Amino acid sequence: MIKKGALTGLLLFGIFFGAGNLIFPPSLGTLSGQHFWSAIAGFVLSGVGLAVLTLIIGTLNPKGYIHEISQKIAPWFAIVYLVALYLSIGPFFAIPRTATVAYEVGISPMLSKNMTGIGLIVFTTLYFAAAYLISLNPSKILDRIGRILTPVFAVLIIILVILGALKYGTTTHQQASQAYSASAFGQGFLEGYNTLDALASVAFSVIAVTTLNQLGFKNKKEYISTIWVVGLMVALGFSAMYIGLAFLGNHFPVPAEIIAKGNPGVYVLSQATQAIFGPTAQIFLAAMVTVTCFTTTAGLIVSTGEFFHKTFPKLSYKVYATVFTLIGFVIANLGLNAIIQYSVPVLQILYPITIVIVLIVIVNKFLPLSKIGMQLTVAAVTLISFASILGQQFHIAWVSDKVNALPFAQASLPWLVPALVGILLSLFLPNKQKSERFEIES
């Protein structure tokens, strides 16, 4: 049981951990100022809690979320939703972001300011060329490198956090930004979306099921117990890491001009490493971040390419891998801040939909729900999410007013009450169904 738990924990850790996630907690710490604890609570809830819960619920159906969504909503919606999800955790956001994080955290601090632009082009060219070659012939070597280096990198980050807290823990924090002053918990909750882990959990739950079955559980009780125990361990571990990094960002001195540029997390991670371990530590940090990000990039190209080839088999896997690598390369050269900025509206649509799907699946494990009720619930959440972004991005006052009139809108959760009401109504509407039981594969 302990061995299986350790192996499962390593699996979950590998799924969630990405060097890109390291920049968001310290950024939150810097920008949240005096509202730190409310902000980090929101971040941990969406960045860790939702991700772990989504993966756990996904492992309770060996056929994955595509089967759950097809049965409860509609097959066409499952395809549209998963295509949008894979494009988000693939070529549009996560793949280019891993490359730019590796460059911004590891390489850029060692270059002069007039070399950062050309440096990014050269770095991403070499980076994506190597990732593409490996994605055409994925091997266990990549997985083994990731399994070894990821825990090592995590331990080093923990050491950085502890030493940073001892050195800077009494330093006065920055003043909170306008967004965090208005709603610290809500802004922190939205920042947690940037980790992309809840979306990745939907995609990787089938992989998790396959790996778990290979461990040879004796019965369903042992299987479920292991999932929940390890899920709790991973949640506590990541929460501690995120809180530590955010605390470091909250107290580490950051110049005003860095804050004005957006995302001071890169600055905190790089400069704190040099301040605590010395200037030569930047070289080691560059190597660790680059390799960790690289394994993630290659893995995402493979998983996204395989999904699209399986879903739309007219094109070969090689074509999809080529296209997604090129898209990732082009978007990466827009820069980290640009990638984060344009990803926010999409994530603010996909995350509420993902959350309500997970809620529906959980409730439906215990109680029969009306299919039309579930469909209307997802439709309502989708509509509210689109309306919220429409009002924000295009400054349509009447749309924003309607959204802001909903409960919890100030906490960035205007869809929450409609979702709960929809699930409640699904208990009483006709055409009820209940989730299928699963069995452990022998």
Set out the residue ranges of the language-model regions.
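Membrane-water interface regions at transmembrane-helix termini and the short interhelical loops
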Residues: L60-G64, E68, L126-L149, Q214-F217, ...
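A generic transmembrane alpha-helix motif of multi-pass inner-membrane proteins
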Residues: K167, S370, M374-S442
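Selective recognition of specific alpha-helical transmembrane segments in multi-pass small-molecule
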Residues: G49, L53, V152-G164, I227-P253, ...
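Hydrophobic, membrane-embedded alpha-helices of multi-pass small-molecule transporters
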Residues: G9-F17, L163-T170, A179-L245, F284-C293, ...
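Hydrophobic, small-residue-rich membrane helices and short re-entrant helix-turn-helix hairpins
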Residues: N137-I148, F185, A208-G237, P255-V268, ...
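Membrane-interface loop-to-helix entry segments
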Residues: S135-G164, S343-I355, M374-L383
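Hydrophobic alpha-helical segments and their helix-loop junctions in multi-pass secondary transporters
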Residues: P91, I95, A154-Y180, A198-L199, ...
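TM-loop-TM module centered on a large, flexible mid-protein loop between adjacent transmembrane helices
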Residues: Y65-Q71, M241-F294, P345
